[in-house]
């Protein structure tokens, strides 16, 4: 079997791909100091590590039967502590939560193994070393529980609620909501071509009541010809019996008859019969013959919208290409919001672009910034 060779991307193309949809993270200690959980747990870990390393050095200088593998456990714990600090300072914890949880689990095994050897030793030096590794084991267990959980979990949301940066967004929750919304859009875009459903090119039975004052036709215009199959483009295979001209003549005849007051009662008596042939289009709500334009008011761009709230974006967000309702925004951007109910809010950018945004990516601020 001959495999087609895929050309390697050039340096410029690879660099462009790395920068695409990427957030630029800069080093800042404020990212660490603004999170009470990270600051407290890292401080306890650093203090416990100092106690453990001091006790191990003192114990190793006193006796020759000190467990050598404990040195690797202490060094490995310091490496994990250093990496966690770097992740917080660059605000990249959400990208490496799985790695932190797995690496901390390995460190938990190392520390508990060292604790079982040192805790039964005699002397204050071994007691200090055992106390240090026990404290490290406790912190490691807490880290496994926190970093191994999703940001949308109740415990993570409770812990992150005390942070100055607020609750962190959940990638898993956003992906599931995107999938559910995409499925709804696919169902809404389906076209039925059976006996009771017609494509979107079919004329709609709706006209403004203001335009028909005095000339109302209580019966909707419907097609009286035979039900013929549709081709892939949704066009009807016309014949001598179902030409569009006959359909137009029937409509004009109905309008002329409606001008005669004597035919008003007759039209009302035939209304139920005509309603049986009424078809349902894409804009029908399935229960009545009225349009459902108001149902999609959240996604409509027509008309003057009111955006009484002001929000500032906490992170950069790239809209899903498969969802036409989402909009992208940059970190620190000011948006106008019209509705703050639910997980997805309707917002307006300074450029005039309107769409929906995830609520956990923004925070409400005082309305003192002009768009």
Curated annotation (Swiss-Prot):
<protein>
    <recommendedName>
        <fullName>High osmolarity signaling protein SHO1</fullName>
    </recommendedName>
</protein>
<feature type="transmembrane region" description="Helical">
    <location>
        <begin position="37"/>
        <end position="57"/>
    </location>
</feature>
<feature type="topological domain" description="Cytoplasmic">
    <location>
        <begin position="148"/>
        <end position="371"/>
    </location>
</feature>
<feature type="transmembrane region" description="Helical">
    <location>
        <begin position="99"/>
        <end position="119"/>
    </location>
</feature>
<keyword id="KW-1003">Cell membrane</keyword>
<comment type="similarity">
    <text>Belongs to the SHO1 family.</text>
</comment>
<dbReference type="InterPro" id="IPR001452">
    <property type="entry name" value="SH3_domain"/>
</dbReference>
<keyword id="KW-0346">Stress response</keyword>
<keyword id="KW-0812">Transmembrane</keyword>
<feature type="topological domain" description="Extracellular">
    <location>
        <begin position="58"/>
        <end position="68"/>
    </location>
</feature>
<comment type="subunit">
    <text>Forms homooligomers.</text>
</comment>
<feature type="transmembrane region" description="Helical">
    <location>
        <begin position="127"/>
        <end position="147"/>
    </location>
</feature>
<feature type="transmembrane region" description="Helical">
    <location>
        <begin position="69"/>
        <end position="89"/>
    </location>
</feature>
<comment type="function">
    <text>Plasma membrane osmosensor that activates the high osmolarity glycerol (HOG) MAPK signaling pathway in response to high osmolarity.</text>
</comment>
<keyword id="KW-0472">Membrane</keyword>
<feature type="topological domain" description="Extracellular">
    <location>
        <begin position="120"/>
        <end position="126"/>
    </location>
</feature>
<feature type="topological domain" description="Cytoplasmic">
    <location>
        <begin position="1"/>
        <end position="36"/>
    </location>
</feature>
<keyword id="KW-1133">Transmembrane helix</keyword>
<keyword id="KW-0728">SH3 domain</keyword>
<dbReference type="InterPro" id="IPR035522">
    <property type="entry name" value="Sho1_SH3"/>
</dbReference>
<feature type="region of interest" description="Disordered">
    <location>
        <begin position="173"/>
        <end position="200"/>
    </location>
</feature>
<dbReference type="Pfam" id="PF00018">
    <property type="entry name" value="SH3_1"/>
</dbReference>
<dbReference type="InterPro" id="IPR036028">
    <property type="entry name" value="SH3-like_dom_sf"/>
</dbReference>
<feature type="topological domain" description="Cytoplasmic">
    <location>
        <begin position="90"/>
        <end position="98"/>
    </location>
</feature>
<dbReference type="GO" id="GO:0005886">
    <property type="term" value="C:plasma membrane"/>
</dbReference>
<feature type="domain" description="SH3">
    <location>
        <begin position="306"/>
        <end position="367"/>
    </location>
</feature>
């Amino acid at each position: 079997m001959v495999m087609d060779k895929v050309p390697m991307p050039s340096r410029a193309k690879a660099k462009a791909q790395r920068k695409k949809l990427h957030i630029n993270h800069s080093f800042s200690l404020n990212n660490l100091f603004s999170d009470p959980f990270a600051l407290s747990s890292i401080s306890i870990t650093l203090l416990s590590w100092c106690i453990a390393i001091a006790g191990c050095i003192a114990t190793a200088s006193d006796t020759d039967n000190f467990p050598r593998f404990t040195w690797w456990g202490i060094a490995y714990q310091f490496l994990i502590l250093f990496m966690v600090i770097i992740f917080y300072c660059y605000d990249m914890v959400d990208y490496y939560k799985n790695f932190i949880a797995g690496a901390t689990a390995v460190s938990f095994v190392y520390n508990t193994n060292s604790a079982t050897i040192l805790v039964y030793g005699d002397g204050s030096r071994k007691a200090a070393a055992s106390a240090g590794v026990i404290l490290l084991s406790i912190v490691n267990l807490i880290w496994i529980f926190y970093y191994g959980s999703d940001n949308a979990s109740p415990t993570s949301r409770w812990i992150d609620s005390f942070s100055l940066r607020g609750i962190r967004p959940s990638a898993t929750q956003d992906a599931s909501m995107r999938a559910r919304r995409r499925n709804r859009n696919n169902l809404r875009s389906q076209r039925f071509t059976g006996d009771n459903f017609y494509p979107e090119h079919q004329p709609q039975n709706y006209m403004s009541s203001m335009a028909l004052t005095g000339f109302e036709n209580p019966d909707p215009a419907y097609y009286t010809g035979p039900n013929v199959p549709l081709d892939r483009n949704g066009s009807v295979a016309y014949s001598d019996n179902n030409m569009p001209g006959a359909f137009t003549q029937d409509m004009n005849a109905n309008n002329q008859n409606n001008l005669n007051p004597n035919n008003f009662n007759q039209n009302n008596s035939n209304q139920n019969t005509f309603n049986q042939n009424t078809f349902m289009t894409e804009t029908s709500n399935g229960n009545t013959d009225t349009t459902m334009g108001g149902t999609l008011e959240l996604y409509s761009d027509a008309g003057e919208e009111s955006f009484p709230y002001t929000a500032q974006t906490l992170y950069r967000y790239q809209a899903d290409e498969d969802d036409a309702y989402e909009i992208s925004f940059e970190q620190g951007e000011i948006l106008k919001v019209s509705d703050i109910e639910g997980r997805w809010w309707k917002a307006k950018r300074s450029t005039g672009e309107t769409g929906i945004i995830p609520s956990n990516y923004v925070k409400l601020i005082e309305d003192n910034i002009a768009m």
